[in-house]
Amino acid sequence: MKPYQRQFIEFALSKQVLKFGEFTLKSGRKSPYFFNAGLFNTGRDLALLGRFYAEALVDSGIEFDLLFGPAYKGIPIATTTAVAMAEHHDLDLPYCFNRKEAKDHGEGGNLVGSALQGRVMLVDDVITAGTAIRESMEIIQANGATLAGVLISLDRQERGRGEISAIQEVERDYNCKVISIITLKDLIAYLEEKPEMAEHLAAVKAYREEFGV
């Protein structure tokens, strides 16, 4: 685990974005942890979040031309990541996002920002079922662009309805790499460093044993 990944876990815990306990997910599964990126909800939170996304992007080594944030959660993520890439990595990248509703006046269309072209890095909070990615792929392909990769905050590394995870399905279906700031493996490594969190460690390991990929 790299220093920025440990810092991201501590940041998420401090904002209660990441919580340990017992939670029922939309899928009906009982999970020993919960991650709600919507609680990164202040200017400072967003500034820090962008820096973590930028670190993961640079760390990945994936080459791309443009950042794309799917509406709605991906919009502030793409924006703050673009700012962080310019401020901390001297890379001034174009970014764009889609509207859920196409405008019928003014500039029109359902895209805002730079022209959607070239190799696109899609940024979002998490991938649960992969639906947002599939919708985004239709937009990317309709504009003649290609998907270079996908960056999310957390990879839960757990099976979907079948034997593989929603992330593995996206990688398979679109022949792209999905990268994340942290993974379930990183969470476990972090808990192993914290003796006072031993009960959570046991629960997360048991969960991985049952649902992990």
UniProtKB/Swiss-Prot annotation:
<feature type="binding site">
    <location>
        <position position="128"/>
    </location>
    <ligand>
        <name>orotate</name>
    </ligand>
</feature>
<comment type="similarity">
    <text>Belongs to the purine/pyrimidine phosphoribosyltransferase family. PyrE subfamily.</text>
</comment>
<dbReference type="GO" id="GO:0046132">
    <property type="term" value="P:pyrimidine ribonucleoside biosynthetic process"/>
</dbReference>
<keyword id="KW-0665">Pyrimidine biosynthesis</keyword>
<dbReference type="InterPro" id="IPR029057">
    <property type="entry name" value="PRTase-like"/>
</dbReference>
<feature type="binding site">
    <location>
        <begin position="34"/>
        <end position="35"/>
    </location>
    <ligand>
        <name>orotate</name>
    </ligand>
</feature>
<feature type="binding site">
    <location>
        <position position="156"/>
    </location>
    <ligand>
        <name>orotate</name>
    </ligand>
</feature>
<protein>
    <recommendedName>
        <fullName>Orotate phosphoribosyltransferase</fullName>
        <ecNumber>2.4.2.10</ecNumber>
    </recommendedName>
</protein>
<feature type="binding site" description="in other chain">
    <location>
        <position position="26"/>
    </location>
    <ligand>
        <name>5-phospho-alpha-D-ribose 1-diphosphate</name>
    </ligand>
</feature>
<feature type="binding site">
    <location>
        <position position="99"/>
    </location>
    <ligand>
        <name>5-phospho-alpha-D-ribose 1-diphosphate</name>
    </ligand>
</feature>
<dbReference type="Pfam" id="PF00156">
    <property type="entry name" value="Pribosyltran"/>
</dbReference>
<keyword id="KW-0460">Magnesium</keyword>
<dbReference type="GO" id="GO:0006207">
    <property type="term" value="P:'de novo' pyrimidine nucleobase biosynthetic process"/>
</dbReference>
<feature type="binding site" description="in other chain">
    <location>
        <position position="100"/>
    </location>
    <ligand>
        <name>5-phospho-alpha-D-ribose 1-diphosphate</name>
    </ligand>
</feature>
<comment type="subunit">
    <text>Homodimer.</text>
</comment>
<dbReference type="InterPro" id="IPR004467">
    <property type="entry name" value="Or_phspho_trans_dom"/>
</dbReference>
<feature type="binding site" description="in other chain">
    <location>
        <begin position="124"/>
        <end position="132"/>
    </location>
    <ligand>
        <name>5-phospho-alpha-D-ribose 1-diphosphate</name>
    </ligand>
</feature>
<dbReference type="GO" id="GO:0005737">
    <property type="term" value="C:cytoplasm"/>
</dbReference>
<feature type="binding site" description="in other chain">
    <location>
        <begin position="72"/>
        <end position="73"/>
    </location>
    <ligand>
        <name>5-phospho-alpha-D-ribose 1-diphosphate</name>
    </ligand>
</feature>
<dbReference type="InterPro" id="IPR000836">
    <property type="entry name" value="PRibTrfase_dom"/>
</dbReference>
<keyword id="KW-0328">Glycosyltransferase</keyword>
<comment type="function">
    <text>Catalyzes the transfer of a ribosyl phosphate group from 5-phosphoribose 1-diphosphate to orotate, leading to the formation of orotidine monophosphate (OMP).</text>
</comment>
<feature type="binding site">
    <location>
        <position position="103"/>
    </location>
    <ligand>
        <name>5-phospho-alpha-D-ribose 1-diphosphate</name>
    </ligand>
</feature>
<dbReference type="GO" id="GO:0000287">
    <property type="term" value="F:magnesium ion binding"/>
</dbReference>
<dbReference type="GO" id="GO:0004588">
    <property type="term" value="F:orotate phosphoribosyltransferase activity"/>
</dbReference>
<keyword id="KW-0808">Transferase</keyword>
<comment type="pathway">
    <text>Pyrimidine metabolism; UMP biosynthesis via de novo pathway; UMP from orotate: step 1/2.</text>
</comment>
<dbReference type="InterPro" id="IPR023031">
    <property type="entry name" value="OPRT"/>
</dbReference>
<dbReference type="GO" id="GO:0044205">
    <property type="term" value="P:'de novo' UMP biosynthetic process"/>
</dbReference>
<feature type="binding site">
    <location>
        <position position="105"/>
    </location>
    <ligand>
        <name>5-phospho-alpha-D-ribose 1-diphosphate</name>
    </ligand>
</feature>
